[in-house]
């Protein structure tokens, strides 16, 4: 993390990232633990929603955020094609079991395995040590992240092709084959909010899988090749030298997740193909006040969830505001990575009485006017 040249810098307890910055083993433990928390939240919340589900009320008008996603994936339908919640409890329990597995893995990496994998006796493990200013190390790790993203896209595409997902156009679950039309994919990046074909949605994910797995291969191979053997010239400032750091990587990560959250908010607000009305409620209307926000267009009578708002309203507004604050975190850490010291801002504000103004070349140097 940014230390501004202080070799003995200390961080407060709430700066959790600083604890694992230079200890890759503990960094992995925090990742696995975080995954376990997500799995536990998903499983527990799904059971909570299922226990309170009322078939007399539209799903989008009650607490059904997790149930709605499962229904859109084609989970919970009986043989007649009606959503009854069959199999949903099993999905939730699997998530709870996995959360315990992830928790155990996190504990192992936290208390048993090496604090830094650079000290591991396993050669393969040592390749995942953290060297924040080493482009070979960072691109190698990035390649593995892209690999898992690509595999997730493939899993989604194959699930839709083999099992099927819910199609609001026909009101039932059907198998969906991807449409790998590159012209369509190129054009859809500009109007994806209005997409109304599940084949096009799957085609976009299939293309993403190809792009991410290609990028994963390139990054993993490049990361396994020493910089001087890549014949790419000198590792200069123009190519990112002295910019690559833990603080910079954190800022880019926050930018990515913030942008995805905002895009998801705009998409979920009005798209009824990927977010069917049956499961998430009616489309929303964008309003402006101190900040943008979305309001329900449906009659709130009978809505029992989220303080009288639909599932869609809760999903969209939470995503948007989380995305907004993630982007603020991105700007904060990006400026710190570039060397900007925010403490000097407060010092300057607190010292306005004795501040001096210097105008270069004008021959003036005096106290600031009061």
Curated annotation (Swiss-Prot):
Per the entry, which co-factors are needed? divinyl chlorophyll a; divinyl chlorophyll b
| GO MF annotation list | chlorophyll binding
* Topology in the lipid bilayer: Multi-pass membrane protein
Its annotated compartments are: Cellular thylakoid membrane
Q: Which UniProt keywords apply?
A: Chlorophyll, Chromophore, Membrane, Photosynthesis, Photosystem I, Photosystem II, Thylakoid, Transmembrane, Transmembrane helix
Annotated GO biological processes are: photosynthetic electron transport chain
List the Pfam families. Answer: PSII
> Membrane-crossing residues?
27-47, 88-108, 140-160, 201-221, 248-268, 315-335
Does this UniProt record's set of keywords contain Lipid biosynthesis? no
Q: Which SUPFAM superfamilies match?
A: Photosystem II antenna protein-like
GO CC terms of this entry? photosystem I; photosystem II; plasma membrane-derived thylakoid membrane
Name the InterPro entries for this protein. Answer: PS_antenna-like (IPR000932), PS_II_antenna-like_sf (IPR036001)
* Function of the protein: The antenna complex functions as a light receptor, it captures and delivers excitation energy to photosystems II and I. The Prochlorales pcb genes are not related to higher plant LHCs.
Q: How does it assemble?
A: The antenna complex consists of divinyl chlorophylls (a and b) and divinyl chlorophyll a/b binding proteins and binds more divinyl chlorophyll b than does the antenna complex from high-light-adapted Prochlorococcus.
* Family affiliation: Belongs to the PsbB/PsbC family. IsiA/Pcb subfamily.
Q: What else is known?
A: This low-light-adapted strain contains 7 pcb genes.
Q: What is this protein called?
A: Divinyl chlorophyll a/b light-harvesting protein PcbD
Species source reads Prochlorococcus marinus (strain NATL2A)
